[in-house]
Amino acid sequence: MKSVLMVAEKPSLAASLAGILSNGRCTAKRGTGNGCSTHEWTGNFRNEGSVHFRMTSVCGHVMSLDFNKKYNCWDKVDPIQLFGCATEKKETNPKQNMRKFLAHEARGCDYLVLWLDCDKEGENICFEVMDAVKHVINNVYSDQVTYRAHFSAITEKDIKKAMETLGHPNENEAKSVDARQELDLRIGCAFTRFQTKFFQDRYGDLDSSLISYGPCQTPTLGFCVKRHDDIQTFKPESFWHLQLLAGQPEVTLEWARGRVFKKDIAIMLLNRVKEHKKATVESVASKEAYKSKPQALNTVELMRICSSGLGIGPFQAMQIAERLYTQGYISYPRTETNQYPTNFDLPAVLHVLKPSADFGEEARSILGDIQTPRKGKDAGDHPPITPMKLGNRSDFDRDTWRVYEFICRHFMGTVSRDLKYRVTTAKLSVGMETFSCTASVLIDAGFTKVMTWSAFGKDEPQPPFVQGTQVAINDVRLIESQTGPPDYLTESELITLMEEHGIGTDASIPVHINNICQRNYVHIENGRKLMPTTLGIVLVHGYQKIDPELVLPTMRTEVERMLTLIAQGSANFQDVLRHAIKIFKLKFMYFVKNIDSMDALFEVSFSPLAESGKAHSRCGKCRRYMKYIQTKPARLHCSHCDETYALPIGNVKVYREFKCPLDDFDLLAFSTGVKGRSYPFCPYCYNHPPFSDMPHLGGCNTCTNANCPHSLNTLGISSCVECPTGVLVLDCTLAPTWKLGCNRCDVIINCFKGATKITVEEAKCQECGAQQVNVVYKSDKSKFKDGSEEKSGCIFCSADFSHLVEKHRAVASRPVRSGGGFRGGKAGRGGGGMGGAAFGSGGAVTAGGGPNAGGGVRGSRVAKDKMGQLASYFV
C-alpha cells in the first residue's frame, strides 16, 4: 500500500483536517518535542485506490533567512558589507528540529500533499517542506508526486472539495517571498546596525534597545509623524457665521454661506438680516434617502473596525482571527477581496447562525428576505471573511467573542436591506440671505437591526414651517469660532493610509504597526490614537533631512510592485534583487556620509552619554566610576575612557566588592528575580570575551578561567539535561538563597535555602558524575534531618539533600569535570564525564564573605588577548 504525507501549517489545523478527511477515524501520535502530532488513517487517493495517509504539520516557516555567522557580529562587520555578503537559510526554531521531523515522517511516503495557508507565505513554506523531505521522497519536485490543496475555510465541504481538486505549489509566489525576505534583511539590518550603534554610543536617554529601520516600518512611522507635524504647525484662523432662531416652537437655522473669514463682512451681513423682522419660507421638501449596507468583509476592514469600534489593535485582532480560523469558526482571515463569489451559498451561512441565542432571531428574519450583496473588489485570492461554524459566548474569552460576533453580524448586514430614512429640508430667506434646517425620520432600519452600532438614532422633529408663509425672527446671532488642528492618526486611519499607498500586505500591516509601538517610536493613546515619541519624530525628521525617500511610501510601493511581478512570473527574481539592492546601497552610503545632519537633531532632543545615568561601578582601566544608564538599552559608560559596555536585560547591581582577576573591573550581579535567572559578570568580559570558548555577552558562569572563584571552572556542577551544551552552575549572587542555573538555557534548580556556605568539591558522584558539594548551615538553622551543621554529597543523588533540592529538571544529570579541556561533548549517565569544562579545584562562596579557593588549580587558561589590550594602560 502506498503512503501519502500531508502537511498543514499549524498543529491545530492538522488535527482539524485529519478529522474531516478521515471522517473522524484517524489515530494520533505525539511528535518529538516540537508540538506537532501525526494523524494516520487509510483512504482513497486519486487513482491509487486505497493508501495510507499521514497528516502532520509545521509551526509556520520552517526556515528563515540570515547572514552567515561571521556577519552577525555588529562590532566587527561594517554594515555596508550586508548589501553583498552571503546569506543562508537557517531553521526558524532549531529546538523544534522541524526538518529532521519532516524527513522522519516522510519515510516510506510516495506522495506529498501540502495544506499550507493559501497565500504567498504559504507557497513559500510549501517549498521549505519540499526541501526538507527531498532526500526521502523521490522526485519530490515533480507534479506527479507533490500536490497543493487550495481552501479558504475549515469546513467539511471546503476541505473535501480541495482534496478532490488538488493543484501544485506556485514557485513564482514562493520566490517573491524569498526576494522580500532578502531585501528586508539586507536593507533593514544595514540601516539598523549603523544608526543603532551610532546614536547609542552618543546619547543616554533614547529609551530604545534598537533604533531600527524597515522599508515598510519607517514609512508607517512617517505617516504618524506627518500628522504630528501638521498638528504642531497648525495656525488657527478665526471665522464667523450667522445663526437664525425663528418660528414657534423655536427652530435654529443654519446659514447657507457657512463660514466667513472676514469679520467686517460678517458684521455687514448681520446688520442686513437685522433689518428684517420676519423670514419667508421658500420651500419645505421631503425625500427618501438611503445608507448602503456594508460590503463583504476583508482583512483591512476587519482590522479597521476592530481598532475603531472594539478597541482591539490590529495585531491582536489578527491573532484572534487566525485562531478562529484554525478552530473552524470563520473562513480564511487574510484576504483583499470584499465581494462574494457568484456561486457563494449565502443562505447556508445564515442557517449556521440560526440557532444562536445572541443573534439567531436576526438570522432567521434575514433568511426570509435575503438581499443581493453590494459589489466590491475581487482580488482573486480568497473569499471574504465569513462565519463558518456557530460559536457561543461561553466558547471564547471576551475579546475573541467580540471579534467573532462582529464577523457574524457584519455578514448578516451584507445581505440585509439598506437603511432607509426620510429627510425634510426647509429653506427660509431673510432679504438676500438664505437659512435652512433639516430633520431625518427613520423608515426602515435595514442592516442596522443586526449591526446595532450603526443604528440611525432618534427621529428628529419636523420643521414647523409651511411653504409661502412668513415666520417671526426671534433672534439672529454672529458666532465666532476658530479652525482647529487635525487629531492624531488613529490605527484605523493609519491602516487606510497604508492600504492606499501599498505599504505592507493584509498580513503584514498589523506587524508594522506593532513594530513601531514596540520600538518606542509611537505610543497608543485613548481612542487608539498614535502619538509619536521624541525618538520617532527625530528619526523621521532626520531621514527627511538626509534623504526624504527613505521615509516616503513611494520607495516601498515600487518595491512591492516589483515583487508582484515576480509572483506573476513577469520579472526575474535575481534581476529584481540586484536592482533594489543597488538602489538602497547607494542610499545607505549617502545616509552614512550625511549622518551628521540627523545627529544635529538628536543633539537637541537627547542627553549625551557623559551627562546621563548615575555612578555605579568602577572601570578596570581608569578606576573611576562608570555611569549606569537604565533607559533601553541598559549600559555602562565610562566618560573618562569614552567607552560603553552593554548589559544584560534585567536588574544589575554591584556584586559586593569582588573584582575580575583579569581586568580589575568591578563584578556585577545580574538577576531577573529570585525565581528567575541570575549570575555574576564582568562588564568588560561580557562585551569582550577573554577566551575563545566563552560566548559574547556571557557571564562568569560561562568563563573558563581557572583562577577565578566565580567562573564556570570553579562553580560548575553538571551538564544541563534540557540543552546539549549547557552546564548547571552554582549561583551565589543571592546567597543565602542558592540555586543552580544553566549557563545556556532557562533551567533553574533551587536548593539549600538558608545555608551559610556552599563549596563545589573536587570529588565526583559515583552514580551520575556530577560534582559533589559541601553545604554548611548555622547550628540553630540546620535543615538536615539529623541536625548536622555540615554535609557533603551529590545534589541529585544524596538522600541527605533530597528534601532540600527541587529536582524537577535535574534527575538525569551528566558529569562535567574531566581531565580534558572544554570540548562540549556528551556522555551518558555515569559514563566517565562530559567535557563541559576542565574544572579547577573546589571553590566556595560564603553568604557573608569573599570567595575561598581550596586546593590546587588545574586546567589554567591564558586569556586570548585581553591582557595585551590593557597592557599599555596598566604599564
Swiss-Prot record:
Keyword Disulfide bond (UniProt): no
Q: Keyword Chloroplast on this protein?
A: no
Please list the residue ranges annotated as the Toprim domain.
Answer: 3-153
Gene Ontology terms: cellular component: DNA topoisomerase III-beta-TDRD3 complex; nucleus
Please tell me the species this chain comes from. Answer: Drosophila melanogaster
Keywords from the named record? DNA-binding, Isomerase, Topoisomerase
Which residue ranges are recorded for the region named Disordered?
A: 371-391
- Catalytic activity reported: ATP-independent breakage of single-stranded DNA, followed by passage and rejoining
Q: Which PROSITE patterns match?
A: TOPO_IA_1, TOPO_IA_2, TOPRIM
Family to which this protein belongs: Belongs to the type IA topoisomerase family.
> Mind telling me which PANTHER family this protein's record contains?
DNA TOPOISOMERASE 3-BETA-1, PROKARYOTIC DNA TOPOISOMERASE
Could you mention a single GO BP entry for this protein? DNA recombination
Protein name per the record: DNA topoisomerase 3-beta
Name the job this protein performs. Answer: Releases the supercoiling and torsional tension of DNA introduced during the DNA replication and transcription by transiently cleaving and rejoining one strand of the DNA duplex. Introduces a single-strand break via transesterification at a target site in duplex DNA. The scissile phosphodiester is attacked by the catalytic tyrosine of the enzyme, resulting in the formation of a DNA-(5'-phosphotyrosyl)-enzyme intermediate and the expulsion of a 3'-OH DNA strand. The free DNA strand than undergoes passage around the unbroken strand thus removing DNA supercoils.
This entry's Gene Ontology molecular function terms read: DNA binding; DNA topoisomerase type I (single strand cut, ATP-independent) activity; RNA topoisomerase activity
Active site as annotated: Y332
In this chain the Topo IA-type catalytic domain maps to 170-589
Catalytic EC class: isomerase
InterPro entries attached here? Answer: Topo_IA (IPR000380), Topo_IA_2 (IPR003601), Topo_IA_AS (IPR023406), Topo_IA_cen (IPR013497), Topo_IA_cen_sub1 (IPR013824), Topo_IA_cen_sub2 (IPR013825), Topo_IA_cen_sub3 (IPR013826), Topo_IA_core_domain (IPR023405)
**One Pfam family, short name:** Toprim
The EC number on file is 5.6.2.1
